[in-house]
Amino acid sequence: MSEYSNRSQAGADYEWHYEYYEDEEPVSFEGLRANRYSIVIGFWVGLAVFVIFMFFVLTLLTKTGAPHPEMCDASMKPHVLIGCELEVGGSLAFSLPPLPDQSRSLFHFYIHKEERVKTHKDAVIGRGMHCGRGNAERADEDEHFMSSFNIPNFVNSEQSSSLGHDDFLLSEPPIITDGQSDELKTAEPAHLCYDIIRH
């Protein structure tokens, strides 16, 4: 190692040094050898990193909402129940919160259009409309109606911002004791009904 020092002529308070390290031996890679399990270790580390990355990606997608492609086939469109109530033996098990004004007007349009399409006299519009499909003719009418009624497949954040996260939670189901469970088995089967029109 060689050393070079210099004192500044202007001020003798400090001095600086250069140290030069001479490489007597060149760097050799002969002693480097891969571990025999390095491929296995690399595979598992890569898999762990990929799983953690996908966990964060899916978490972000569930928070922001993934874009849904438009379905070409009308029969493939999902049927959504909005404002539905479940009645079990005359008691109300749960109900959803009332609809916002804009979505209420969409469902008024839905009801009026359905009134024009229907030919059955015994169908009831509004409260008490059964969610279950009665016969094949009703299913054909629903497919025809759903193909002509196009609901946009996105959520407008301005309308939904007035509702909090807790507004979408269902109330807790009732506690059923052993004596009541026998009564429910013998009672009428549960049916769903729409509760759409609220003023």
Curated annotation (Swiss-Prot):
Biological-process GO terms, alphabetical: energy homeostasis; energy reserve metabolic process; positive regulation of adenylate cyclase-activating G protein-coupled receptor signaling pathway; protein localization to plasma membrane; regulation of adenylate cyclase-activating G protein-coupled receptor signaling pathway; response to starvation
Subcellular location: Cell membrane; Endoplasmic reticulum membrane
Self-association and partners: Interacts with mc4r.
Superkingdom classification of source: Eukaryota
Pfam families membership: MRAP (PF15183)
Purpose: Activator of melanocortin receptor 4 (mc4r), a receptor involved in energy homeostasis. Plays a role after larval development in the control of energy homeostasis and body weight regulation by increasing ligand-sensitivity of mc4r and mc4r-mediated generation of cAMP once the zebrafish begins feeding, increasing the capacity for regulated feeding and growth.
InterPro entries, sorted: MRAP (IPR028111)
GO cellular component, one term: Golgi apparatus
Alphabetical UniProt keywords: Cell membrane, Endoplasmic reticulum, Glycoprotein, Membrane, Transmembrane, Transmembrane helix
Glycan-bearing residues: N6
TM region(s), chain numbering: 39-59
Protein family per UniProt: Belongs to the MRAP family.
GO molecular function, a single term: type 5 melanocortin receptor binding
Gene that encodes the chain: mrap2b
Miscellaneous section: Two paralogs of MRAP2 are present in zebrafish: mrap2a, which plays a role during larval development and mrap2b, which constitutes the ortholog of mammalian MRAP2.
Topology relative to the membrane: Single-pass membrane protein
Tissue distribution: Expressed in adult brain.
Name of the protein described by the UniProt record: Melanocortin-2 receptor accessory protein 2B
Main location: membrane
